[in-house]
Amino acid sequence: MTNFPKIGKTPPNFLTIGVYKKRLGKIRLSDYRGKKYVILFFYPANFTAISPTELMLLSDRISEFRKLSTQILAISVDSPFSHLQYLLCNREEGGLEDLNYPLVSDLTQTITRDYQVLTDEGLAFPGLFIIDKEGIIQYYTVNNLLCGRNINELLRILESIQYVKENPGYACPVNWNFGDQVFYSHPLKSKIYFKDLYSPKKSS
């Protein structure tokens, strides 16, 4: 039995076919190592209800992910030709016309199974994995099939991961957004932050 991918560990590699800008090509996860962060964005299947709302918003905000040197790979158990048909359909029909990142085919369900997001019905749970430039898993979530994911939260998490990796010794507190106060990750030093945050405020 495959172990569930763990934070701080190398994710299962894969080589498969993807579709980008209506062209089919090979996609290998390890090719991004040393170059970019990668978001693996699993979704149940093409032409479902929730998936296009997530996938199109990711596409509309692709510039924000590119600024963070991040590649999005959307993965489902559909064939490359199903992906191509999905990309040929316009938004009004629930399609993904002009999508700004690849759709990855996992027709054999190998990738979905390796990442432990395969449903009993043979679809993919809405799983999400953030992999850093060193090829290490830094974050993952798995959602209810009928609950859409929050792209603002995804960007916030991505920025916080990059911040703490680039600034050793610091941590990002609750609801942190880029530019907000950070504090020391050491338990003793972090008390400086707690004192400032929770001490009674003096009235003027």
From Swiss-Prot:
It catalyses: a hydroperoxide + [protein]-dithiol = [protein]-disulfide + an alcohol + H2O. It holds the Pfam family AhpC-TSA. The active site is a conserved redox-active cysteine residue, the peroxidatic cysteine (C(P)), which makes the nucleophilic attack on the peroxide substrate. The peroxide oxidizes the C(P)-SH to cysteine sulfenic acid (C(P)-SOH), which then reacts with another cysteine residue, the resolving cysteine (C(R)), to form a disulfide bridge. The disulfide is subsequently reduced by an appropriate electron donor to complete the catalytic cycle. In this typical 2-Cys peroxiredoxin, C(R) is provided by the other dimeric subunit to form an intersubunit disulfide. This is Putative peroxiredoxin ycf42. Residues 5-163 form the Thioredoxin domain. InterPro entries: AhpC/TSA (IPR000866), Peroxiredoxin (IPR050217), Peroxiredoxin_AhpC-typ (IPR024706), Thioredoxin-like_sf (IPR036249), Thioredoxin_domain (IPR013766). Belongs to the peroxiredoxin family. AhpC/Prx1 subfamily. Keywords: Antioxidant, Chloroplast, Oxidoreductase, Peroxidase, Plastid, Redox-active center. It comes from Trieres chinensis (Marine centric diatom). The lineage of its organism: Eukaryota, Sar, Stramenopiles, Ochrophyta, Bacillariophyta. GO terms for cellular component: chloroplast; cytosol. It is found in: Plastid, Chloroplast. GO terms for molecular function: thioredoxin peroxidase activity. GO terms for biological process: cell redox homeostasis; cellular response to stress; hydrogen peroxide catabolic process; response to oxidative stress. PANTHER family: THIOREDOXIN PEROXIDASE, THIOREDOXIN-DEPENDENT PEROXIDE REDUCTASE, MITOCHONDRIAL. Its EC number is 1.11.1.-. It comes from the Eukaryota.
